[in-house]
Amino acid sequence: MSRIIVEATTSDCAVTTILGLLRCGFQAKTARISYNLNKCLPPPEEFDKYPLILVGTLKHSSLAVHVYSVTAGYGGTGPHAMVDILEAAGFKFEDSDILTADHADSNGQIDLVYHR
């Protein structure tokens, strides 16, 4: 499986990049969200721990897209960018899953998986 790392400096840049991939034909089938409210973003070199990983296909090839600068668990710009990406990719979910800490465990960890 090929991999694209989206290490944008802002969540808005991440949204723009993902929208471009979607326009080029990327079809996300699975979205994995993993974010810790207490630890915030992982080190940039640990791309397997990025807050959003989209898995799907682009031109009949398997592709994983690791997105760095989006977050979850509160109402800021990072979580709103996550919502924008998930909506654009066609996932069904409740905004409150992303914009609140309702799904955080006692350590502040949020882990969600959506399928299309």
Task: Give residue spans per PLM region.
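Extended, alpha-helix-rich binding/interface surfaces that flank or overlap catalytic cores
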Residues: 2-6, 12-22
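A short, exposed loop/beta-hairpin motif centered on an aromatic-Gly-Thr core
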Residues: 3-8, 66-75
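Ser/Thr- (and often Asn-) enriched beta-sheet segments in non-cytosolic proteins
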Residues: 3-5, 30-34, 111
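Hydrophobic, Leu/Ile/Phe/Ala-enriched alpha-helical segments that form helix-helix packing faces
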Residues: 18-25, 85-90
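Amphipathic, interaction-prone secondary-structure segments
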Residues: 21-58
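Low-complexity, intrinsically disordered regions in eukaryotic regulatory proteins
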Residues: 51-71, 97
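Mixed-charge, Lys/Arg-enriched low-complexity segments
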Residues: 83-116
